[in-house]
UniProtKB/Swiss-Prot annotation:
Source organism of the structure: Bordetella pertussis (strain ATCC 9797 / DSM 5571 / CCUG 30873 / LMG 14455 / NCTC 10739 / 18323)
Pathway(s) of this molecule: Purine metabolism; AMP biosynthesis via salvage pathway; AMP from ADP: step 1/1
Recorded domain comment: Consists of three domains, a large central CORE domain and two small peripheral domains, NMPbind and LID, which undergo movements during catalysis. The LID domain closes over the site of phosphoryl transfer upon ATP binding. Assembling and dissambling the active center during each catalytic cycle provides an effective means to prevent ATP hydrolysis.
EC category: transferase
Function: Catalyzes the reversible transfer of the terminal phosphate group between ATP and AMP. Plays an important role in cellular energy homeostasis and in adenine nucleotide metabolism.
Renumbered residue ranges of the record's region LID: 122-159
Gene: adk
Binding-site residues for AMP, renumbered to this chain: 31, 36, 57-59, 85-88, 92, 156, 167
Catalytically driven reaction(s): AMP + ATP = 2 ADP
Superkingdom as given in the UniProt entry: Bacteria
Protein name: Adenylate kinase
EC code: 2.7.4.3
Amino acid sequence: MRLILLGPPGAGKGTQAAFLTQHYGIPQISTGDMLRAAVKAGTPLGLEAKKVMDAGGLVSDDLIIGLVRDRLTQPDCANGYLFDGFPRTIPQADALKSAGIALDYVVEIEVPESDIIERMSGRRVHPASGRSYHVRFNPPKAEGVDDVTGEPLVQRDDDREETVRHRLNVYQNQTRPLVDYYSSWAQSDAAAAPKYRKISGVGSVDEIKSRLSQALQS
């Protein structure tokens, strides 16, 4: 099973990715993890990437594709792989295609923007323990305080509504075009293209898991 999960921040991709990697026995491949591992191992591509990053530059798509190819030769990828946060842009998707890197499915998890804003801006955390709550879906026993210690809960900067809206804008401008890219490729060249599936990310974790499993069997 070789696939990409697409969807806006807060759509639940992380939860579903964890289910898929366990279910299919495949690794979740993140470009960030890959870069860090290559730099640490001192591979030729890792050293090249380190040079660029140390100079404050952005690692080129060609370099990323090289790292992806290296990563996919490792034994844990024998049954497949799940790309996490990659590709992010059309040039990266084109580079992936040109490199002949195989994909079986591209799955989009669709959640209305208003739901995402409610999901993310409602999160509250207890900094010392990491316990998390949600003002609507998983509220603390007493408003605004941790169940165990009674200490105040905080809203992380990442979860503030204006930050969430900004991240959604970035997604719409940068990554959303990938949805059109893969869906139109699947329509125009079904034999060569990965199968494109769209599922709703609204509902319980188990409901979404069930939709995802069905999508990957069709």
